[in-house]
C-alpha cells in the first residue's frame, strides 16, 4: 500500500515538474516576445491628430478597414457634417462683428438647422442635406467659416461640407480619406498592434483633452518611445476646454511637462509637427499672423539646417521651422543626454507622408529599443 502511494506521489511530482517546465518555457517565450515589441505612446493635446496617425498605421500595416468598419463610420461622418453646419451657422450671430447671410431667404434654413439638427435623436432627412448644401454655398456662411479660429470648429468641416452630395447617397461607402478625416473624440486608452518587416509594434493612443491626461501614467511602463503630436495650425486658436489658452502654447507647455517628467527622463521623443497642410493654408492666406500670437516670430530667421519642398512658400518654411524651434528650445534647455527629441513635419491625413515619416522613424525606434534593454 505504501509503495503504491509512493509511486503515485512520484508521478504527481513528475507531472508538476513537467507543468512547471512548460510554464517556464512559455514565460521565457513571452518575455522574449515582450522584449521584442516596440511600445509607442502617442501623446499630445486634444485634436492634434493622434488618432489619425493610428488610422494610418492600420491602413499601412493592418490591411486597412473592412467593409463592415466602413459602414460603421457613416454615422460618425454624418455627425461631423451636422456638427460643422450647426457650429458655423450658430457662430454667425455670436461673432464680433456678426456675419450676415448673403441671401436673407436662407434664414429659414438656418433656423431649421439650429432647431431640428441640434436634437439628440436626429435622423438626417433629405431636407437636411438640401439645406446644408445651399447654406454652405452662401457667402455669409463662407465668411463665418473663414473666421473659424474665433470659435470651436472641427478641422474636417470643409472637407465633409464639400462632399455632402456624396455622403447623402443611400449607397455611400466611406473612402479611406473619409475615415482619416472623420473626427471622433478619443476617451480612454486604445492599443493598436501591427508588424513591419517582422518587428512588432504596439501603439497606444490616449485622449488628449485635459481631463483625459491623468490616464497617461498608466501607459508609461516599458515605453520604447513617445510620439508627441502637435497641431501646428493651432497657433491662432484656443482650447475647446479652455477659451483663455492658446492651443499651440498649451501644446508647448504639455511637451515641456512630458520632457521634464521624472518617469520619462530616459525615453526619447519623436515630435510630429502635424497639420502642415492647414498651417500652410493659414500662413498663405495672411489673415492670422503668427507674430500676433507669438511676438518673437517677428525677429525669427530661418535656420541654416532648414530645407523646403519644391515650390514651397518661403513664409510657410519660416513658420514651420519657427514652431519646430520652439519645441527644440525646450528639449535642449533641459537635455541631459539621456533622451533626445527627433522632429518631423507631418500631415496625418496624407498616407504617403506618414509612410515616409514612419519609415524614417523606425531606425530611431530600433536604436531606442536596443538602448532600453542595454543591447546597444
Curated annotation (Swiss-Prot):
A lipid is attached at residue 2 (N-palmitoyl glycine). PROSITE patterns: G_ALPHA. Residues 36-376 form the G-alpha domain. One of its GO terms (molecular function) is G protein-coupled receptor binding. SMART domains: G_alpha. Mg(2+) binds at residues 51, 186. Residues 39-52 are annotated as: G1 motif. GO terms for biological process: adenylate cyclase-activating dopamine receptor signaling pathway; sensory perception of chemical stimulus. Pfam families: G-alpha. The keyword tRNA-binding does not apply. Residues 178-186 are annotated as: G2 motif. Keywords: GTP-binding, Lipoprotein, Magnesium, Metal-binding, Nucleotide-binding, Palmitate, Transducer. A lipid is attached at residue 3 (S-palmitoyl cysteine). The keyword Nucleotide-binding applies. GTP binds at residues 44-51, 180-186, 205-209, 274-277, 348. InterPro entries: Gprotein_alpha_S, Gprotein_alpha_su, GproteinA_insert, P-loop_NTPase. Residues 270-277 are annotated as: G4 motif. Residues 346-351 are annotated as: G5 motif. Residues 201-210 are annotated as: G3 motif. GO terms for cellular component: cytoplasm; heterotrimeric G-protein complex. Guanine nucleotide-binding proteins (G proteins) are involved as modulators or transducers in various transmembrane signaling systems. The G(s) protein is involved in hormonal regulation of adenylate cyclase: it activates the cyclase in response to beta-adrenergic stimuli. Belongs to the G-alpha family. G(s) subfamily. G proteins are composed of 3 units; alpha, beta and gamma. The alpha chain contains the guanine nucleotide binding site. This is Guanine nucleotide-binding protein G(s) subunit alpha.
